[in-house]
């Protein structure tokens, strides 16, 4: 058999590229050990571990599970992207732990996004100073209850005892029970100095002393603290600093990827840097922006194209997009659709996820704003009946406002198949009512008692009739549980139901993939564009001409709720002036904390 000659065919030579790991995170210890900045960071981490007596060296015990560890490197950056410091962290390989031997309980709660947004809104309303705290090596404050043995860290093996292992006393990062141990340790100390946990969210802590009140919000080791007396807040920070290695980062500007900007109108919260980094990570920097995050009237179907050979990039992208919905309600529906195909993503699903990135490219500076005004709750509830062509389950969409500001929203598939559009709308009403009731409980923990029930706007007359008329018949008896729940809240005046036209239904944004004119109109009612004067480019022209945001709580001046349809409401503008104190806030519509 004749074969083709290999004359003139050569193996390509690998091109050696020098990577500057002083501006990038090294992937391994061998690379990091060649750069003095990262060596200094590892030395600082190791000394901190030794100072806190994280472990003691013991001979290798027989028949015990040994967990290894590794160094993880992170560049800590300022909100503008510049390098703040080099961080090296020793992390245990917790996936090597064995249940019942070296770990048991692992659950640790985190604060709900709506709680964060509500705290920011109330801080603007009452002029509370928002301060940010960070606990260095937070997990190391947690005390382990189980025996955990770990191999000595690479580069720091004791020459006198090279065969010994580390018996851990503190909850090192990476251990399965580390977050729980830290949460128990910190909350125990908070309760000791007088804080009490919110009944609505266990990560919100409240301290009342005479006329002073302090609110502390905990998200793992990141903390927001605020209150009506700055000196008293400072004293609490000093008291906590006596028990933990606490850093007072000053005024809140950057929290969990959220950028908080201060204007004369209040706060503007956005994730511009996070979105920019995400677009760059997936190589979409030069992509052409599109007007909507999903194609109008489109549905993502399983097995509609070949499966991805590696689903990891898709899952990583959708997970990152899911976090962007913290300040981007306009992404909720598109991300919800993408999340349904995590197990078996196809090429079409990946293209749909990349379309969201294209939409982000054109709307990088969008976010939500918190401005002072009358305190009232209003909500919008909608559903897309049998919208999923595969299982014919309906979709619930809702958005809840505190005054002018959206504080909670969602696009979620209903758990059961609805036999009629009325049933789907009624189940959406029940879900929105439950969320409203929870937010009202949260407001009470803040010391705020609303004089009027929240308004819940629905565009289905039949669903409203079921809620207000105690009549059962063959078509509604199977939704009896939801019926009793909503009916009870209406009778107790925990919520007031009102009809709204489909055109004015803001929750429509969360139930259907809309054409760009309708989508942009609804988005303009929920979101603001970052004041361009603060960015240094041309001024953004807002929808309103008078420069003042219109009321969104549908109340008359005396606070009495009305059935006025909000066709012209939610037109928002944001002043671009420098920071200054808010004056003349309206507080007449609620009993507020002092």
Model regions and ranges:
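Metal/cofactor- and membrane transport-associated sequence elements
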Residues: 1-245
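Alpha-helical coiled-coil heptad-repeat oligomerization segments
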Residues: 28, 34, 44-47, 51, ...
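Acidic, Ser/Thr-rich intrinsically disordered and amphipathic helical segments
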Residues: 28, 37, 41-44, 114-118, ...
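Structured nucleic-acid-interacting core domains from mobile-element enzymes and related host factors
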Residues: 61-67, 123-127, 359-383, 450
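RNase H-like nuclease fold core
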Residues: 89, 93-95, 321, 380-422
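C-terminal reverse transcriptase regions that engage the nucleic-acid substrate
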Residues: 114, 120, 172, 177, ...
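RNase H-like nuclease module associated with reverse transcription
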Residues: 254, 341, 374-376, 394, ...
């Amino acid at each position: 058999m004749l074969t083709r000659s290999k004359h003139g065919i050569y193996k390509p030579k690998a091109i050696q590229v020098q990577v500057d790991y002083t501006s990038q995170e090294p992937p391994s210890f061998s690379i990091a050990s060649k750069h003095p900045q990262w060596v200094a960071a590892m030395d600082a981490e190791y000394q901190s571990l030794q100072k806190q007596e994280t472990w003691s060296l013991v001979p290798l015990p027989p028949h015990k599970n040994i967990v290894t560890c590794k160094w993880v490197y992170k560049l800590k950056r300022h909100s503008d992207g510049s390098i703040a410091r080099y961080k090296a962290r020793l992390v245990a390989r917790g996936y090597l732990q064995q249940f019942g031997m070296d770990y048991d309980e692992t659950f640790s709660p985190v604060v709900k996004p709506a709680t964060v947004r509500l705290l920011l809104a109330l801080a603007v309303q009452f002029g509370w100073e928002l301060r940010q705290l960070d606990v260095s090596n937070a997990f190391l404050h947690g005390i382990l209850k189980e025996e955990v043995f770990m191999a000595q860290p690479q580069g720091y093996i004791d020459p006198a005892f090279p065969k010994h292992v580390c018996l851990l006393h503190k909850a090192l990062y990476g251990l399965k029970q580390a977050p729980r141990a830290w949460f128990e340790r910190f909350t125990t100390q908070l309760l000791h100095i007088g804080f009490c946990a919110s009944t609505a969210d266990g990560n919100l802590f409240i301290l009342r002393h005479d006329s002073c009140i302090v609110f502390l919000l905990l998200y793992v080791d990141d903390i927001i603290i605020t209150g009506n007396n700055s000196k008293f807040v400072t004293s609490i920070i000093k008291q906590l600093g006596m028990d933990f290695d606490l850093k007072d980062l000053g005024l809140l500007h950057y929290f969990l990827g959220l950028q908080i900007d201060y204007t004369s109108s209040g706060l503007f919260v956005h994730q511009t840097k996070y979105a920019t980094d995400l677009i760059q990570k997936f190589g979409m920097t030069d992509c052409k922006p599109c007007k909507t995050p999903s194609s109008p009237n489109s549905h993502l179907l399983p097995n509609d194209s070949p499966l991805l050979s590696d689903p990891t990039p898709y899952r990583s992208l959708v997970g990152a997009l899911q976090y962007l919905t913290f300040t981007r309600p306009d992404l909720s529906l598109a991300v919800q659709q993408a999340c349904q195909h995590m197990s078996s993503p196809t090429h079409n699903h990946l293209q749909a996820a990349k379309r969201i990135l294209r939409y982000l490219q054109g709307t990088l500076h969008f976010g939500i704003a918190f401005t002072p005004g009358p305190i009232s709750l209003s909500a919008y509830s909608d559903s897309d009946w049998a919208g999923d062509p595969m299982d014919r389950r309906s979709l619930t969409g809702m958005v809840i406002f505190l005054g002018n500001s959206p504080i909670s929203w969602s696009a979620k598939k209903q758990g059961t198949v609805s036999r009629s559009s009325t049933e789907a709308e009624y189940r959406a009403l029940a879900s929105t009512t439950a969320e409203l009731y929870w937010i009202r409980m949260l407001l009470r923990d803040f010391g705020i008692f609303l004089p009027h029930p929240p308004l819940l706007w629905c565009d289905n007359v039949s669903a409203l009739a079921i809620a207000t008329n105690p009549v059962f018949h063959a078509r509604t008896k199977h939704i009896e549980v939801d019926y009793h729940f909503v009916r009870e809240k209406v009778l107790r005046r925990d919520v007031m139901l009102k009809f709204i036209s489909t055109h004015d239904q803001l929750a429509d944004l969360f139930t259907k993939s809309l054409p760009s004119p309708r989508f942009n109109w609804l988005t303009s009612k929920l979101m603001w564009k970052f004041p361009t004067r603060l960015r240094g480019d041309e001024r953004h022209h807002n929808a309103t001409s008078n420069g003042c945001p219109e009321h969104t709580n549908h109340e008359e001046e005396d606070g009495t709720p009305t059935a006025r349809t909000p066709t012209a409401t939610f037109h928002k503008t944001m002043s671009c002036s420098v920071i200054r104190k808010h004056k003349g806030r309206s507080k007449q519509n609620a009993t507020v904390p002092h």
